[in-house]
Amino acid sequence: MSEYLFTSESVSEGHPDKVADQVSDAILDAILAQDPKARVAAETLVNTGLCVLAGEITTTAQVDYIKVARETIKRIGYNSSELGFDANGCAVGVYYDQQSPDIAQGVNEGEGIDLNQGAGDQGLMFGYACDETPTLMPFAIYYSHRLMQRQSELRKDGRLPWLRPDAKAQLTVVYDSETGKVKRIDTVVLSTQHDPSIAYEELKNAVIEHIIKPVLPSELLTDETKYLINPTGRFVIGGPQGDCGLTGRKIIVDTYGGAAPHGGGAFSGKDPSKVDRSAAYACRYVAKNIVAAGLATQCQIQVSYAIGVAEPTSISIDTFGTGKISEEKLIALVREHFDLRPKGIVQMLDLLRPIYSKSAAYGHFGREEPEFTWERTDKAAALRAAAGL
């Protein structure tokens, strides 16, 4: 029987790029809490002893950006110079400008050529869902995120006190070529930052027994499963001391782990007028509801926009041969049941709220948090009825 392999990865909240994402989204949330109509594009750079805040922000909110950045870094766990990055001791520079008026007139409702709220930029976005996991996410990315959440949990509650914030996980999964179903887990790679005092064998055994095995489905772990734990043998220097971190560099981790295409636009630090973020969330909402409705077991949707124009310039759907109705009919249902104009998306998903910090680590999709409206399946019944199933 033929098989194929597929791999996805996740990173922890202490990974330098994720530190940057979380600072950017914490600043976005602090602004939206006071000014829901703010225009925010908050970028962050973190390096040894340094946090740089830059980008474009137009708002009436009064926010202590330096305080927000320090509190976020401290919450992640970088609270000591021994870790190479200290929330209280690092220098924080603030270099924000305002949104370009040329862009603003295309986004502000009633201005520009299109009197509806136009898209904040041109671009293409994808959404995806499949029936491999309970939250309709691909297997490898879903469980890679769960491994990283487990690492954080054991670090913060003190059960494995030698863990440090920076970590990465990677899963290679074996699929049956005929059924397309997961057969077993081939390889688990998990690298975690640690105190210098811990012996390698003790670390390896603890990671396998306390992080990996409680998370991954036991029936998919076999005698052939390979465990690669801190493969270099040592991971003491990490976080922003080990690598420079930037907002928006983990876009595949943030989405579907490579199981679906990506339009290229990052999420964190962007208010919902930026379709890079809001339309990608809407695409996930559409795809998840199509799969939840039983109209397909796998669904990928692409939408595209032009700056300053409200209506999408294209909508396309691929169900990879699993659809119960044609893709043309699915597109018609999407147009009928989902408003994919920027303002329609914001209203449909209630996005003008300070809900984004939680999304900045462990994936934007496949987590059924109460704030994550794009994970609801409240349109599934209507879609199924409209399809005549």
Curated annotation (Swiss-Prot):
Residues 99-109 are annotated as: Flexible loop. GO terms for molecular function: ATP binding; magnesium ion binding; methionine adenosyltransferase activity. CDD domains: S-AdoMet_synt (cd18079). Its cofactor is Mg(2+); K(+). Pathway: Amino-acid biosynthesis; S-adenosyl-L-methionine biosynthesis; S-adenosyl-L-methionine from L-methionine: step 1/1. InterPro entries: ADOMET_SYNTHASE_CS, S-AdoMet_synt_C, S-AdoMet_synt_central, S-AdoMet_synt_N, S-AdoMet_synthetase, S-AdoMet_synthetase_sfam. It is found in: Cytoplasm. Binds 2 divalent ions per subunit. Binds 1 potassium ion per subunit. One of its GO terms (biological process) is S-adenosylmethionine biosynthetic process. It catalyses: L-methionine + ATP + H2O = S-adenosyl-L-methionine + phosphate + diphosphate. It holds the Pfam family S-AdoMet_synt_N. L-methionine binds at E56, Q99, D243, K274. Transmembrane segments: none annotated. Mg(2+) binds at D17. It is an enzyme of class 2 (transferase). K(+) binds at E43. Its EC number is 2.5.1.6. GO terms for cellular component: cytosol. ATP binds at H15, D166, A167, K168, R234, F235, D243, R249, K250, A266, K270. Catalyzes the formation of S-adenosylmethionine (AdoMet) from methionine and ATP. The overall synthetic reaction is composed of two sequential steps, AdoMet formation and the subsequent tripolyphosphate hydrolysis which occurs prior to release of AdoMet from the enzyme. Homotetramer; dimer of dimers. Belongs to the AdoMet synthase family. This is S-adenosylmethionine synthase. It comes from Neisseria meningitidis serogroup B (strain ATCC BAA-335 / MC58). The gene is metK.
